Amino acid sequence: MNIVLVGLMGSGKTAVGRLLAERLGRPFVDTDRLVEADAGRTVADIFAAEGEEGFRRREAEVVARAAAGDNQVIATGGGAVLRTENREALRRTGFVIWLDAEPETLYDRARGQGLHRRPLLSGPDPLGRLRALAAARRPFYAQAAHVRICTDRRSLQDVVAEIMEKLQERGERG
């Protein structure tokens, strides 16, 4: 069974996913990086050339491929849950964990990584945009996830430890 991390940009999917995969001795898959590798362009460049819909089409293909694998830790793009087929494939083949945080925390993290890498936050009010994205996507994350973990003011190690506890509760051994 895969372990799948969903959540908004800045929630910790990639950083937590890498550490979790290392602890479990499993491969780590980042769907945004797979989309970039397939396209030969960055996510920002794909958004600029093809728009969000073009990116989401590419993302759906990658999510289907990733979900078809087994025993991986998968970090999805923040909007992967918007498509029904993605939510269904991820839930069917994995234990889906929603990494959640307050919009202010997400904004601080995204800003630290460079807002230019986040096409959905371009514009005059990135924090306001992030608040709107959080409100709009919350129902999709809730529908996709088996469990929700808050990452506000927590270390990567602490979040990974909580995930390990959740896996043990489910009888998963990693």
Curated annotation (Swiss-Prot):
It catalyses: shikimate + ATP = 3-phosphoshikimate + ADP + H(+). GO terms for cellular component: cytosol. Substrate binds at residues 32, 56, 78, 137. One of its GO terms (biological process) is aromatic amino acid family biosynthetic process. Its EC number is 2.7.1.71. It comes from the Bacteria. InterPro entries: P-loop_NTPase, Shikimate/glucono_kinase, Shikimate_kinase/TSH1, Shikimate_kinase_CS. Pfam families: SKI. CDD domains: SK. Pathway: Metabolic intermediate biosynthesis; chorismate biosynthesis; chorismate from D-erythrose 4-phosphate and phosphoenolpyruvate: step 5/7. Its main location: cytoplasm. Its cofactor is Mg(2+). It is found in: Cytoplasm. Binds 1 Mg(2+) ion per subunit. Mg(2+) binds at residue 14. GO terms for molecular function: ATP binding; magnesium ion binding; shikimate kinase activity. Belongs to the shikimate kinase family. Catalyzes the specific phosphorylation of the 3-hydroxyl group of shikimic acid using ATP as a cosubstrate. Monomer. HAMAP family: Shikimate_kinase. This is Shikimate kinase. It comes from Symbiobacterium thermophilum (strain DSM 24528 / JCM 14929 / IAM 14863 / T). The lineage of its organism: Bacteria, Bacillati, Bacillota, Clostridia, Eubacteriales.
